[in-house]
């Protein structure tokens, strides 16, 4: 999309950019009370926009047990036992990565019972699509064994592994223990983690009732009432299929992480071919094609932008089919419907997406985590390895890509993600650093209908700016991930200045 003019100085007044220039023209504005900030030759950029962020969950998880780096059941068990010894009434843990575990599988409830059997233990996988409970937790949360996604053994007893509808139900039950005051306290404490990475706007993917039925969600209701209180622009995607609820709230967006399929890690992302390491398995879609068509039709009638969480190419087929069906009655291009992730999009699907005006919200960090030779993508996809996250071909088809971290799946830093897009493990899928930067600036604004307000440094736009710690023109591609943010400005106010702590 657009690349703004290069300039040497920017004048801010209140919450807007009012003047750009080169040379010493800024001197005419040097008056008492004007603060000057010298970037000292470092690069100044628009504030970063993260288009796929789970704000409330990320904030709450700061107090959970982090299983990052636990590569054996033994290491996992040690961390959980420490949490039990601290006297936690409920042990909540996240970032359990089955791909990194030596055992290459999730623990069972019986194995968790051996670690802790006198209180609920709740483990969330790194891809946030699988939950593992001990026996105490299964009883504590009163999980119905008949729910879709409950893992059962040969005796029809629960294994402790929950996916799909069952996992969504569990998320709802866990969040019931948190009050609005808990949400606020966690959010206030967490926001500096975004500011120090230069993020000034997020698309907040909130709620977990899209697989469990209609009705209000406590996370979403909290943000509807309180988002404007924070020094961060929060654009809410209400993760539900209840169109009437979202329309009545006066919101413009629905879905986000609206699961159309599962993930590669759990062999549940919906494919048109078998998994390389599990012949005969192709994953599955959560919704029928008929339901998808009627849902999209209702959203279009109510003017709602939709975010579809679709990873495998069969799931992407379902989304594009529903959009093509809606396009028979109306022009869907101006609605900028989105596919989140779209990791295995085919060439013919790129052509359809471009024709329908679909925006792809993608996560370059996935390639750094799973895309390397011998990594999870290659294990699951075999011959199709190399077809994931094809940023170059997608852009060449005229599709807008915006970027998101999907935190806590990937780390927050947009610069790390930008590095991943530029240094894709499959070189032909890489893009230029300018294209990668646009994923988190002007393209990010476009994906949220905010391109007239932010996303570039231009007169009249929001005074959302960041100063990096160096000149990007002097940074090699291999060093992009090392670039830090020195200063973050939101609506003309400094909200972050770097210290050694960040």
Question: Which residues are covered by each model-predicted region?
Answer:
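Active-site microenvironment of metallo-dependent hydrolases
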Residues: 1-29, 81-87, 180-196, 200-201, ...
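Divalent metal-binding segments
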Residues: 2-230, 236-244, 265-298, 302-311, ...
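Non-cysteine beta-strand/loop elements that form the S-adenosyl-L-methionine
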Residues: 54, 252-268, 358-368
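Residue-level recognition of conserved beta-strand edge/terminus positions
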Residues: 94, 124, 363, 466-469, ...
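Extended low-complexity acidic/polar segments
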Residues: 117-118, 279-280, 351-374, 501-502
